[in-house]
Design a protein with these regions (language model features):
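C-terminal catalytic/motor cores of large multi-domain enzyme assemblies
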Residues: 1-153
């Protein structure tokens, strides 16, 4: 809840629910950030279905008014273009942006010291420090990373 805010330059506003903006590029290279309503309790399969529906409707030009509600964070995924790491910019009134890089297979050591292939992905979180301090952002990014490690492949 302490991160679920927007900032218009003058006023910090708390928002209800857990809306997450998704950066979606259209074929004309216009980027929209429609919002999916997610919670930590939302089953992963349902979240995937909501996200696919929202992205499809955005690219088809069928965004609805309820898709454009305020969100505290937007997710920008350039990993789908093979980009390993990047830093997206926070777009007001949002106060955070999560940059998602490509999943890569790299050599790593398992618990017994054997070399194994491991999937890694770079996440970068930008935050507006007028609203979210660095410790809050780091804790939030750590929680996202832990959640993603539990997601079924």
């Amino acid at each position: 809840p302490e991160l679920n805010k927007t900032f218009d330059g003058d006023r910090i506003t708390s928002i209800t629910g857990q809306p997450v903006g998704l950066a979606v590029a259209t074929e004309n290279h216009v980027v929209f950030a429609p919002v999916v309503q997610a919670t930590v309790e939302t089953p992963f399969a349902e979240l995937v279905a909501q996200t696919r529906d929202l992205i499809g409707r955005t690219r088809a030009g069928q965004i609805r008014a309820e898709d454009a509600v305020p969100a505290a964070i937007t997710i920008s995924n350039l990993g789908m273009y093979g980009v390993s790491a990047f830093t997206a910019m926070v777009t007001p009134p949002q106060v955070m942006v999560l940059s998602v890089g490509a999943i890569r297979r790299v050599p790593a050591f398992d618990a017994q010291g054997a070399v194994v292939a491991q999937s890694i992905m770079t996440l970068t979180l930008g935050s507006d420090h007028r609203v979210i301090n660095g410790a809050q952002a780091a804790t939030f990014l750590g929680a996202i990373a832990q959640w993603l490690q539990k997601v079924p492949s």
